[in-house]
Amino acid sequence: MQSEDGDVAPTIDVSVPHPARRYDYWLGGKDNFAADRESGDAIAAQFPGIRTAVVENRRLLRRAVTQLAAEQGIRQFLDIGTGLPTASNTHEVAQLIAPEARIVYVDNDPLVLTHARALLTSSAEGRTAYVDADVRDPDNILHSREVADTLDLNQPVALMLLAVMHFVTDDEDPYGIVKRLVTALPPGSCLVLSHATADWMPPETAAMIQSGKHGAGRLRGRDEVARFFDGLELIEPGVVPLAEWRSEATPPPAAEVAMYAGVARRPS
């Protein structure tokens, strides 16, 4: 099957759970299949806080993008692992502050691609684009036509890696991937990263979530998450439990969310 622009549309494998569709299920969306729901329910049975975690991750996105656009003057965003469109997507938050903001979304689920083309529409002053790619191949993202046509890599870019790097296992070089992406961006660019952790989980829960059938490739501790920001200048409050990052209200307990988050700037 071909899309309107002539690209061949990849096939959706509904028998295998996909993180973007499972995330949609936890958020109460309808763009998911039986395999996604089965996997999502299995994880929720062991870790009931998962729905709180995904809601808090979306709230973090809003806070971080607002901070970067309003306080750091960022006008370009590269959002990798964007997931299915929902309320307060990156471009919507950024363009409320700066209508001229430009955003490139990246994901590797064909269903996300279909919805992104239809729903992730920019303001008249700005621009959005979508890249069908995997974070594990950063050069494919950086050298894509969409990035070249949408972003000026001579000007600061916010790299958004929300709830994605825990799907990259140690043998897939997660730190090298992030370093490759960050070093391709100019000084003044920022990294926004959230990451699941087992720091507050019983060992059996962590083992199930990290299993090949259901989960994250690697839950990492705080020091391991902080390592993604090596060489960057952390913005206050640093690497903290996700819901506590510049929280606007009393956050849920760290153990209920079981994620860390941080925002950092590439120095001049």
Each language-model region and where it sits:
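Rossmann-like AdoMet
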Residues: 1-133, 137-150, 258
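Short alpha-helix
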Residues: 216-239
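Core SAM-dependent methyltransferase catalytic element
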Residues: 238, 243-268
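A short SAM/SAH-binding and catalytic strip from SAM-dependent methyltransferases
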Residues: 135-136, 145-175
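Short "lid" loop at the C-terminus of a central beta-strand within the Rossmann-like core
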Residues: 164-167, 196-200
